[in-house]
A protein has these predicted regions:
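Basic, glycine/lysine-rich polyanion-binding surfaces/domains
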Residues: 1-165
Length: 165
């Protein structure tokens, strides 16, 4: 049985890992963030940038690769105060977009994450696993994005291809 899905490997993305309290992050990064998500495991979006709350005092800033230089200049990772950590990790992740009518079925095959809208809302963003690999999973209006460590990109692409056959 085939599934009606499209799996696309997304090019590199700008990704910053931030650790610290919301107040400390706001004091340092302030206007350069899309805003803080309302609840853990969700994302706030503004101007194509996403700010993800993925754990206690743990955040990810995700944006188009063209924004990396400007964000680096604004966030100044090497000058961050000692109560926060700002690290550019853009080169560590491989992103995939999964879209189509059967996208929920494919994600259910790939991951144990409960994707019901009451549990994983439209702006859901969390770490879980995909085919046993640690994966960042984002709900998007058209489906999902999955990100795995760069070295596992080909493996995840193969697993997704096999799951949709």
């Amino acid at each position: 049985m085939g599934y009606d899905v499209d799996i696309k490997r997304i090019g590199a993305m700008t990704l910053f890992d931030l650790k610290g309290t919301q107040k400390a992050i706001l004091n340092w990064c302030g206007p350069h963030l899309p805003g803080f998500p309302d609840t853990p495991n969700t994302a706030a979006t503004r101007d194509e940038a996403m700010f993800l709350h993925i754990g206690k005092d743990h955040w990810l800033l995700l944006a188009d690769l063209s924004q990396e230089g400007a964000l680096y200049a604004h966030l100044k990772p090497t000058e961050a105060p000692p109560d926060i950590s700002v690290v550019c990790v853009s080169d560590t992740q491989c992103f995939f977009a999964i879209t189509g009518a059967d996208v929920d079925q494919i994600l259910s095959i790939a991951s144990p994450l409960d994707i019901h809208a009451t549990i994983f809302p439209e702006n859901g963003a969390t770490y879980s696993e995909a085919f046993g690999l640690k994966a960042l999973i984002l709900r998007k209006p058209e489906g999902y994005w999955l990100a795995v460590e760069q070295s596992f990109g080909n493996m995840l692409e193969d697993y997704l291809s096999r799951a949709t056959a």
